[in-house]
């Protein structure tokens, strides 16, 4: 599913409209001296839901970062969604990051699975297994499997996923959104070479997470 509006995420349009109407009403009723705070809030809401276009690396064996944020885990772990041992790389998104998720690789979706759960701080490790989450398992043409998991956080309470099993995905394609801070775990085949380290800031699509 191609996303036709690359500047402001459509998920934010209702919030932007409400903030704009409130700012205008206060401005007309009470003047700028009272409404400036609401205009500032509108600016914050617009920047929060920004969704800029990103350059997409063309390196054939590259796994792209699915989200903006900070790397909080690079480790060997069990991938419960594809039932295998894997290299796990986790990205934590705070409230100031872009909140759309993009496909890390080209492939076909073999499974989309949703799990209800808790709303722990998404930066902690147990959020991967205890929080509300949605897993997308992607099978690549070369036989490799890549799993991308959207995980809700302490404030984020709604995971949006726009793809289904059987559909194709292309690297950098926008496939989901999580509001107000969250986490994305990526599980890669054992032997993949990580290109990021813990604490590093990363950008969706333009940062290479690892090489297969």
Curated annotation (Swiss-Prot):
GO biological process, one term: phosphatidylethanolamine biosynthetic process
PANTHER family attached to this UniProt entry: ARCHAETIDYLSERINE DECARBOXYLASE PROENZYME-RELATED
EC number: 4.1.1.65
Encoding gene, per UniProt annotation: psd
Designated name of the protein: Phosphatidylserine decarboxylase proenzyme
Pyruvic acid (Ser) modified-residue sites: 182
Protein family membership: Belongs to the phosphatidylserine decarboxylase family. PSD-A subfamily.
UniProt-annotated site: Cleavage (non-hydrolytic), residues: 181-182
Cofactor: binding comment: Binds 1 pyruvoyl group covalently per subunit.
GO MF entries: phosphatidylserine decarboxylase activity
A Pfam entry, by short name: PS_Dcarbxylase
Compartments (UniProt record): Cell membrane
Annotated active site: 182
Assembly, per entry: Heterodimer of a large membrane-associated beta subunit and a small pyruvoyl-containing alpha subunit.
Keywords: Cell membrane, Decarboxylase, Lipid biosynthesis, Lipid metabolism, Lyase, Membrane, Phospholipid biosynthesis, Phospholipid metabolism, Pyruvate, Zymogen
Cofactor names: pyruvate
Tree of life domain: Bacteria
HAMAP family xref list: PS_decarb_PSD_A (MF_00664)
UniProt xrefs under InterPro entries: PS_Dcarbxylase, PSD-A
Major location (coarse): membrane
Entry keyword annotation includes Lipid metabolism: yes
Topology in membrane: Peripheral membrane protein
Record PTM: Is synthesized initially as an inactive proenzyme. Formation of the active enzyme involves a self-maturation process in which the active site pyruvoyl group is generated from an internal serine residue via an autocatalytic post-translational modification. Two non-identical subunits are generated from the proenzyme in this reaction, and the pyruvate is formed at the N-terminus of the alpha chain, which is derived from the carboxyl end of the proenzyme.
Catalyses which reaction(s): a 1,2-diacyl-sn-glycero-3-phospho-L-serine + H(+) = a 1,2-diacyl-sn-glycero-3-phosphoethanolamine + CO2
GO cellular component, one term: plasma membrane
């Amino acid at each position: 599913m191609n996303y036709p509006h690359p500047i402001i995420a459509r998920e934010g349009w209702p919030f932007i409209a409400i903030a704009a109407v409130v700012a205008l009403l206060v401005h007309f009723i009470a003047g700028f001296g009272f409404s400036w705070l609401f205009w500032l809030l509108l600016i914050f809401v617009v920047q929060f839901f920004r969704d800029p276009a990103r350059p997409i690396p063309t390196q054939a064996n590259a796994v792209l970062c699915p989200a903006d944020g900070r790397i909080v885990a690079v480790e060997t772990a069990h991938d419960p969604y594809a039932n295998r041992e894997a290299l796990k790389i986790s990205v934590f998104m705070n409230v100031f990051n872009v909140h759309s998720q993009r496909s890390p690789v080209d492939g076909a979706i073999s499974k989309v699975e949703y799990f209800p759960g808790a709303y722990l701080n998404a930066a902690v490790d147990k959020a991967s297994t205890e929080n509300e989450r949605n897993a997308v398992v992607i099978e690549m043409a070369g036989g490799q499997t890549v799993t991308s998991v959207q995980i809700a956080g302490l404030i984020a309470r709604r995971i949006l996923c726009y793809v289904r099993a059987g559909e194709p995905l292309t690297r950098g394609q926008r496939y989901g959104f999580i509001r107000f801070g969250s986490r994305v775990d990526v599980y890669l085949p054992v032997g993949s070479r990580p290109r990021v380290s813990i604490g590093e800031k990363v950008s969706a699509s333009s940062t290479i997470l690892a090489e297969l």
